[in-house]
Amino acid sequence: METFLFTSESVNEGHPDKLCDQVSDAVLDACLAQDPDSKVACETCTRTNMVMVFGEITTKANVDYEQIVRDTCRSIGFTSDDVGLDADNCKVLVNIEQQSPDIAQGVHGHLTKKPEEIGAGDQGHMFGYATDETPELMPLSHVLATKLGARLTEVRKNGTCAWLRPDGKTQVTVEYYNGNGAMVPVRVHTVLISTQHDETVTNDEIAADLKQHVIKPVIPEKYLDEKTIFHLNPSGRFVIGGPHGDAGLTGRKIIIDTYGGWGAHGGGAFSGKDPTKVDRSGAYIVRQAAKSIVASGLARRCIVQVSYAIGVPEPLSVFVDSYGTGKIPDREILKIVKENFDFRPGMISVNLDLKRGGNGRFLKTAAYGHFGREDPDFTWEVVKPLKWDKVQA
């Protein structure tokens, strides 16, 4: 049996780039909660002792941007300079303007147009991916890397590993074989964790705690063997972290946000963007399409692409590839997809209820992945049953 290695990485919520994603989406949530028609393009950057929010926002909402920044940083765990940022005393800079009237007139008309008439907020192409290798219909390498990051945060916040600090990165290499186009995991080849820690803990304590409290609860035993390699804080020291260690910027972790390097990516980031931005809404609808294809048994693995022109409601193209795992030809799967999914941006917002704010809805997406999550707010993860002729197949 010929196998290959594939690696996916993740970062947890204290990573500077992810801090910025969370601030941007917290701003989006606040705007949508008061005004579902808010037009939001919110970027965030951070460095030592400073967080800045900037961009274009047109909303009727009354939003305290500085308070959102401080609350978000505090909830992550940035409560002192020692851990990388002091949420209550850092500098907060705000430079928010209204959306360009050129873009607004060419795209939205959202107060007068019907949802099906609303044009795309920009050009671009987005990809959705699904695979039957995990219950989430997501790649195993990505799922494990993401869950390790989430577990790091959990044991930090609940006090199990009190020496942990907010910043951290994970990476998992999985050995696969290709089963006629379907990806079949064989074993976990390598686990890498680099996590920020306090001054008191030893490297041996770090390694022991990570194996016991992070790796063991996350990675199923069947994937681990005596040959599995563990790199646990291999640099030897990671005390300085968060924005004090590295600058951060919204939209710098787009592969972590999606499929861990599997499938494809059109390049557009998600966080801080309202649903008229097809970078986000387009990626959500093609994930639902790909997931529904696999869940309905049409294919074991597939990718769906959609593309748009600014101001035009109808997509320019829709593409499906089942990697040879389809039970029926890809052209037939594409026909089913077009019959069951409405790719017009206004209708995506309606069908996935994307204008609904509150409950930290989009903030939740900004760490630990936008896909493969069991949460009623992740409406794009709801499988749409697809009818097809199994006898003919």
From Swiss-Prot:
What does the entry list as the binding residues for Mg(2+)?
9
Positions contributing to L-methionine binding: 56, 99, 246, 277
Q: In which pathway does it act?
A: Amino-acid biosynthesis; S-adenosyl-L-methionine biosynthesis; S-adenosyl-L-methionine from L-methionine: step 1/1
Name its cellular compartments: Cytoplasm
Q: Which GO terms describe its molecular function?
A: ATP binding; metal ion binding; methionine adenosyltransferase activity
Q: Which reaction does it catalyse?
A: L-methionine + ATP + H2O = S-adenosyl-L-methionine + phosphate + diphosphate
Indicate which residues the UniProt annotation says bind K(+): 43
Any idea which positions bind ATP? 15, 167-169, 235-238, 246, 252-253, 269, 273, 277
| Chief localisation class | cytoplasm
Query: CDD domains from the xrefs?
Result: S-AdoMet_synt
Q: What is its EC number?
A: 2.5.1.6
User: Which terms under GO biological process does the entry name?
Assistant: one-carbon metabolic process; S-adenosylmethionine biosynthetic process
Top-level taxonomic group? Eukaryota
Quote the record's cofactor note: Binds 2 divalent ions per subunit. The metal ions interact primarily with the substrate. Can utilize magnesium, manganese or cobalt (in vitro). Binds 1 potassium ion per subunit. The potassium ion interacts primarily with the substrate.
Its Gene Ontology cellular component terms are:
cytoplasm
Q: Which cofactor does it need?
A: Mn(2+); Mg(2+); Co(2+); K(+)
UniProt keyword terms in alphabetical order:
ATP-binding, Cobalt, Cytoplasm, Magnesium, Metal-binding, Nucleotide-binding, One-carbon metabolism, Potassium, Transferase
HAMAP family hit by this protein = S_AdoMet_synth1
Assembly mode? Homotetramer.
The record's similarity note reads: Belongs to the AdoMet synthase family.
State the protein's name. Answer: S-adenosylmethionine synthase
**Record organism:** Litchi chinensis (Lychee)
